[in-house]
Amino acid sequence: MSAVITSMIVIGAGSYGTALAITLARNGNKVLLWGHDPVHVQAMKVARCNHAFLPNVIFPSTLYLETSLPVALTASRNVLIVVPSNVFGSVLTRIKPHLRPDARIVWATKGLEMNTGRLLQDVARDILGGHIPLAVISGPTFARELAAGLPTAIAIAATDVTFSADLQQLLHCSKSLLVECNIDFIGVQLGGALKNIIAIGAGISDGLGFGANARAALITRGLAEISRLGKAMGATPSTFMGMAGLGDLVLTCTDNQSRNRRFGILIGQGIEVQTAQKNIGLVVEGYTNTKDVLKLASRYRVVMPITEQLYQILYHNKNVYDAALTLLGRYYKDKQISYL
């Protein structure tokens, strides 16, 4: 059995995967959406809506749904992965036997491989081999606003310029979605992963009641940390001033649609880490990434004081006020340093 031939298969029927599928379909593309829970997918088929994550957003007629993964993967050579980073590798392993010979893989997952801190491009190459074109979508995007058709801008980077151009054509919409192509594959991935950590810090600052001034300072210092690590890992520093860097960082640090920010707010208000995670109810990418990024910082000999203090708070129960004083004391001592 074969699925309807489409321009894109979207793997992951959560809020963001569904929003991207809706956006692609609104652009006149045939799109197939697959989710791991067949009951959820069947409910969407009947309702023509993802009531669990995006209620009241009706699916375009060119958005199709499929419960069988092998059948779904016959629909297109273009496969968009939109799953949490902690299951990214297992999802690739699952889809590998069913991919078409001409398959191309793009992901909108933001994060690093859990426990190793590896970039998702390295995970993908290890599992799929080096012959499959790879791409990443990142940038300041909340699923609800994207699904509602509100103006949004994203960045795309790919290992193949043809793939990048094809993705831009599929996604770009003059009315609502601006798509920027970037050749910095490493930087676009890092920006999407590291901003979650800084967003937790911004949330803690706001939970403590430190105000807008402190939040702005933390975002600025956080961007400097991201840029330093990115440069050490081979990224282009200017990438972090674009959509995949500053754009995503500002969005995630300042709006309560961000679960990483909400998680930080709870901790700043005195809620224990594990309780805060349960209250959020969804994967908090920045929590696991904090430990992994600190390992990367050590490996590349990059100073990341905000990440270090967040690690102490999240994994060693350091008092949040003491962590803030540590940062303030450091910046006073380093006041002659011109580079943030």
Curated annotation (Swiss-Prot):
Q: What is this protein called?
A: Glycerol-3-phosphate dehydrogenase [NAD(P)+]
Q: Name one GO cellular component term.
A: cytosol
Q: What is its EC number?
A: 1.1.1.94
| Pfam families referenced in this protein's UniProt entry, alphabetically | NAD_Gly3P_dh_C, NAD_Gly3P_dh_N
Annotated sn-glycerol 3-phosphate binding lies at K110, G139, T141, K195, D248, S258, R259, N260
In this UniProt entry, which cysteines form S-S bonds? none
- Stored InterPro entries: 6-PGluconate_DH-like_C_sf, 6PGD_dom2, G3P_DH_NAD-dep, G3P_DH_NAD-dep_C, G3P_DH_NAD-dep_N, NAD(P)-bd_dom_sf
Q: Which GO terms describe its molecular function?
A: glycerol-3-phosphate dehydrogenase [NAD(P)+] activity; NAD binding
Keyword list (alphabetical) reads: Cytoplasm, Lipid biosynthesis, Lipid metabolism, NAD, NADP, Nucleotide-binding, Oxidoreductase, Phospholipid biosynthesis, Phospholipid metabolism
Q: Pathway listed for it?
A: Membrane lipid metabolism; glycerophospholipid metabolism
Q: Which reaction does it catalyse?
A: sn-glycerol 3-phosphate + NAD(+) = dihydroxyacetone phosphate + NADH + H(+); sn-glycerol 3-phosphate + NADP(+) = dihydroxyacetone phosphate + NADPH + H(+)
Outline what the protein does.
Catalyzes the reduction of the glycolytic intermediate dihydroxyacetone phosphate (DHAP) to sn-glycerol 3-phosphate (G3P), the key precursor for phospholipid synthesis.
Question: So where's the catalytic machinery, residue-wise?
Answer: K195 (proton acceptor)
Q: Which SUPFAM superfamilies match?
A: 6-phosphogluconate dehydrogenase C-terminal domain-like, NAD(P)-binding Rossmann-fold domains
What are its GO biological-process terms? carbohydrate metabolic process; glycerol-3-phosphate biosynthetic process; glycerol-3-phosphate catabolic process; glycerophospholipid biosynthetic process
Recall the taxonomic lineage recorded for the source organism: Bacteria, Pseudomonadati, Pseudomonadota, Gammaproteobacteria, Candidatus Palibaumannia
Protein family according to the UniProt entry:
Belongs to the NAD-dependent glycerol-3-phosphate dehydrogenase family.
What's the source species for this entry? Baumannia cicadellinicola subsp. Homalodisca coagulata
Binding residues for NADPH, per the UniProt record? S15, Y16, H36, K110, A143, R259, V283, E285
Q: Where in the cell is it found?
A: Cytoplasm
